Swiss-Prot record:
It comes from Xenopus laevis. PANTHER family: N-ALPHA-ACETYLTRANSFERASE, N-ALPHA-ACETYLTRANSFERASE 50. Belongs to the acetyltransferase family. GNAT subfamily. InterPro entries: Acyl_CoA_acyltransferase, GNAT_dom, N-term/lysine_N-AcTrnsfr. The gene is naa50. Its EC number is 2.3.1.258, 2.3.1.-. This is N-alpha-acetyltransferase 50. The keyword Nucleus applies.
């Protein structure tokens, strides 16, 4: 049997419906039309993941200038349940990390994860992400509503820089 192929492809107006469908199945939250309109504008920061030519997952990010930093925000990164633990999430996250590395100007990369999603938390921790805070009632209409903010620092900060970021251990 031939080895399985995992490939990443661009999100385009022709396949945006596939992305919508994947997100509806994978995530307990729904995304509005503006989300999908914005995704079409971010180029390499949004990718569909294919397993043997079947769209099974996606990653969508955006550049965020907050806290006087240039940050990459992972809006969504997910894969259909039957295709998990095959390296698809790793391929998507590595794609995003490589973009940040090549760019060289990002301070950090961050995302929100539902506090009950232990497999996602473990996944991101393997890549050097840390829980930096927990936001109460972050999600609407899903339980638990709280979200961890996971962050991976990309720049070696000089002493004193980022001293205002509170680390919370959970």
């Amino acid at each position: 049997m031939k080895g399985s192929r995992i490939e990443l492809g661009d999100v385009t107006p022709h396949n945006i419906k596939q992305l919508k469908r994947l997100n509806q199945v994978i995530f307990p939250v729904s995304y509005n039309d503006k989300f999908y309109k914005d995704v079409l504008e971010v180029g390499e920061l949004a990718k569909l993941a294919y397993f043997n030519d079947i769209a099974v997952g996606a990653v969508c990010c955006r550049v965020d200038h907050s806290q006087n930093q240039k940050r990459l925000y992972i809006m969504t990164l997910g894969c259909l349940a039957p295709y998990r633990r095959l390296g698809i999430g790793t391929k998507m996250l590595n794609h995003v990390l490589n973009i940040c590395e090549k760019d060289g100007t990002f301070d950090n990369i961050y995302l929100h994860v539902q506090i009950s999603n232990e497999s996602a938390i473990d996944f991101y921790r393997k890549f050097g992400f840390e829980i930096i805070e927990t936001k109460k009632n972050y999600y609407k209409r899903i339980e638990p509503a709280d979200a961890h903010v996971l962050q991976k620092n990309l720049k070696i900060s000089s002493p004193g820089q980022n001293a205002d970021v509170q680390k919370s251990e959970n």
